[in-house]
Regions:
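N-terminal lobe/hinge region of extracytoplasmic solute-binding protein
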Residues: 1-26, 34, 56, 120-121, ...
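Gly/Pro-rich hinge or "lid" segments in bacterial periplasmic/extracellular proteins
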Residues: 13, 92-93, 98-149, 153, ...
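Surface-exposed binding/hinge segments that line
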Residues: 23, 33, 67-109, 129
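Ligand-site clamp/hinge motif
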Residues: 110-113, 141-187, 312-313, 321-323, ...
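Append "and occasionally in soluble cytosolic enzymes with long acidic Gly/Pro-rich linkers
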Residues: 137-140, 190, 217-313, 377-379, ...
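Extracytoplasmic/peripheral linker and loop segments enriched in polar/acidic and small residues
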Residues: 235, 273, 317-332, 346, ...
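Ligand/substrate-recognition segments at binding pockets and active sites
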Residues: 278-351, 396, 424
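Long beta-strand-rich cores associated with HINT superfamily self-processing modules
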Residues: 426-454
Length: 454
């Protein structure tokens, strides 16, 4: 339904969308030239006023949005004429361009509180109706600037149960499921008359560590946990190969990814040695008594609980008794934001990782909740310094150097323990064709999908 000024390509760099050009005449100024002739769903043309309204909300102190943190450096946004917009920064911020490829999407000038009841965008589909906890109905927008969709519209159904989604797909009441079937159910469709599309995804599963915890603030304990986890086994058996072992928050597709950063291998003997060094010797040899006890909070989703059980067993093998506690996601998330945890397991999803500035929002010392996502209260002055240098750098090569150095330190400090990056998976009925999955796994490609027999 909506578009941003820019999109991201397969290499996660920005590419034109509603904007056709971006100029950066000085470190504090970005000039956007809009694509002409772009129509909103109600027929009026996109202009600079709509862009100014949308981004003006990001710097309005009274406006509440989870996306405002990405625009902390934005000072002002000004319409120069109908098709040109000037963004002025408070300080140099080299990651600003990629922020224009993420949320917020552009909305019409003056959109108010009732906008959610009948949203209007510039995307390939327009809103028809919405039923809470049931479905969203979208119709093709024939005047879409990127070409009208090749189908008659989309109905997005809400099916909260994994098994139900699989059964509905099997019997034909739905045509397609994207990234919403667990590996065991995907496996049931293999070798049958269904299309299964896969692509390397960005979603990132990790253990978050409370760096203020008296036990876990010892890096030797964190490393002992890292060496005790067999990621390859989790990927192969639990994920059925629909993931790859992760090395850090920056995905391998990203231009700033450093393939040489420190990585944990599966080494339970090294784990036991580190626990000995940290003052947690084995109290009874091969007996049942643990070296220490820790707790892990997870959501009560089945996949999360199964993975936690596997990790629990792997840690038990080195003498760590892991108390796994599962909650409704909202309850668990509130605990995490408030620092009420020793460890937690969550995922970063898709587009959040398209630019390495995510490292600042997650690991910079002052980015603790509610200001940012440093939920474990990680604090390393050298990482802060490197991220400041990366943010002020004027070339991609400079940024990559500083981000690479920061990644190395973060990996060795282990405030996160990486588990896997998801493989994007779409399972479609044989009547569909033209499906392509981009790295973020979003629904943009639906406009090119056709359905035979209709």
């Amino acid at each position: 339904m909506f578009n941003q000024l820019f999109d991201t390509g397969e290499d996660l760099r920005p590419k034109p969308m509603l904007a056709e050009r971006l100029d950066n005449p000085d470190p504090l100024t970005y000039l956007v030239t809009l694509r002409r002739g772009v129509k909103f769903h109600d027929g009026h043309e996109l202009t600079a006023k709509d862009v100014v309204f949308t981004y003006g909300q990001m710097i309005d102190p009274s406006f509440v949005s989870p996306f405002k943190g990405a625009f902390r450096s934005l000072k002002s946004v000004t319409a120069l004429d109908y098709y040109h917009v000037r963004f002025t920064l408070k300080e140099p911020f080299s990651a600003f361009a990629i922020q224009l490829a993420g949320p917020p999407a552009i909305v019409p000038d003056g959109a108010g509180p009732d906008f959610a009841d009948h949203p209007i965008g510039t995307g390939p589909y327009k809103f028809v109706r919405f039923a809470v906890d049931d479905q969203v109905v979208l119709a093709p927008f024939e005047e879409y600037f990127g070409g009208a969709p090749r189908n008659n519209g989309v109905i997005i159904r809400v099916l909260p149960d994994d098994t139900m989604r699989g059964l509905e797909l099997q019997k034909g009441s739905i045509d397609l499921v994207v990234n919403d079937l667990p590996p065991d159910i995907v496996h049931q469709f293999e070798g049958k008359d269904f299309h299964i599309a896969k692509s390397p995804g960005l979603d990132y599963s990790y253990l978050g560590i409370n760096m203020l915890d008296p036990v876990l603030k010892d890096k030797r304990v964190r490393h002992a946990i890292g060496y005790a986890i067999d990621r390859h086994a989790i990927v192969e058996y639990l994920r059925r190969g629909l993931a790859r072992p992760a090395t850090g928050l920056i995905p391998s597709q990203a231009w700033a990814y450093d393939p040489d950063i420190f990585q944990f291998t599966y080494d339970p003997n090294r784990s036991r040695q580190l626990l000995d060094e940290a003052g947690y010797p084995d109290p009874d040899g091969d007996g049942p008594l643990p070296r220490l006890r820790l707790s892990l909070k997870v959501s009560n989703a089945e996949e999360s609980r199964l993975q936690a059980t596997v990790i629990q067993q792997q840690l038990r093998d080195v003498g760590i008794d892991l108390d796994v506690r599962s909650y409704e996601f909202a309850t668990m998330y509130a605990d995490v934001v408030n620092g009420n945890f020793q460890m937690f397991n969550m995922q970063w999803v898709g587009g959040a990782m398209v630019d390495p500035d995510i490292l600042r929002r997650v690991f910079y010392s002052t980015q603790t909740p509610p200001a940012g996502y440093n939920r474990g209260h990680y604090n390393n002055p050298e990482v802060d310094r490197l991220l400041d240098l990366a943010g002020a750098a004027t070339t991609e090569a400079e940024r990559k150097k500083y981000y690479g150095a920061a990644q190395q330190i973060i990996a060795e400090d282990a405030p996160y323990i990486s588990i896997w990056n998801r493989t994007n998976v779409a399972v479609a009925r044989p009547t569909l064709s033209g499906l392509h999955l981009n790295p973020t796994g979003d629904f943009e490609a639906l406009k090119d999908v056709t359905k035979s027999g209709v």
